[in-house]
């Protein structure tokens, strides 16, 4: 097969998440709760050869467009990812993910004694203290969180 040939078919409407760090595609699907239960066609390609990086993962989801919360999750898991919005088989928007200064409601604090894990139903707020290293800190209890062990709300 020539390199210019498509390995997976194009989508008519939806989102293509490209340049996902190698081996993170499944984690991205889980974090974004993309499982096909809504009837959307999902294509995932793992360990695809890449010019920029040695390998990458790609996810295509028909009839789904990411919300800001989804983009923030993606920025933590796969900081080099790009989000491509497709309409009528054409690229209408392309953007790189980037971490905001704070992330609200998406992740749970790993500290069992944190007020956000109490019965009071307080929404979590994570401050991004190092965008390059993807280091988050709970605003309520100051616990520094390992991005590889985050739990999603």
Curated annotation (Swiss-Prot):
Transmembrane segments: none annotated. Belongs to the PyrI family. One of its GO terms (cellular component) is aspartate carbamoyltransferase complex. This is Aspartate carbamoyltransferase regulatory chain. Keywords: Metal-binding, Pyrimidine biosynthesis, Zinc. One of its GO terms (molecular function) is metal ion binding. Pfam families: PyrI, PyrI_C. Zn(2+) binds at residues 109, 114, 138, 141. The keyword Zinc applies. It comes from Nitrosopumilus maritimus (strain SCM1). One of its GO terms (biological process) is pyrimidine nucleotide biosynthetic process. It comes from the Archaea. Its cofactor is Zn(2+). NCBIfam families: ATCase_reg (TIGR00240). Contains catalytic and regulatory chains. Involved in allosteric regulation of aspartate carbamoyltransferase. Gene3D superfamilies: Aspartate carbamoyltransferase regulatory subunit, C-terminal domain (2.30.30.20), Aspartate carbamoyltransferase regulatory subunit, N-terminal domain (3.30.70.140).
């Amino acid at each position: 097969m020539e390199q210019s040939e498509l390995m997976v078919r194009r989508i008519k409407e939806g989102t293509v998440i490209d340049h996902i760090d190698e081996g993170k595609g499944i984690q991205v699907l889980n974090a974004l709760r993309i499982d096909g239960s809504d009837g959307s066609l999902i294509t995932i390609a793992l360990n695809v050869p890449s010019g920029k990086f040695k390998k990458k993962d790609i996810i295509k989801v028909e009839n789904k467009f990411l919300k800001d919360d989804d983009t923030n999750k993606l920025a933590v898991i796969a900081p080099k990812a790009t989000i491509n919005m497709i309409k009528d088989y054409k690229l209408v928007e392309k953007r790189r993910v980037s971490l905001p200064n704070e992330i609200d409601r998406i992740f749970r604090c790993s500290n069992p004694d944190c007020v956000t894990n109490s019965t009071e139903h307080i929404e979590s707020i994570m401050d991004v203290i190092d965008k390059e290293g993807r280091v988050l800190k709970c605003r309520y209890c100051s616990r520094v969180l390992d991005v590889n062990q985050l739990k999603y709300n």
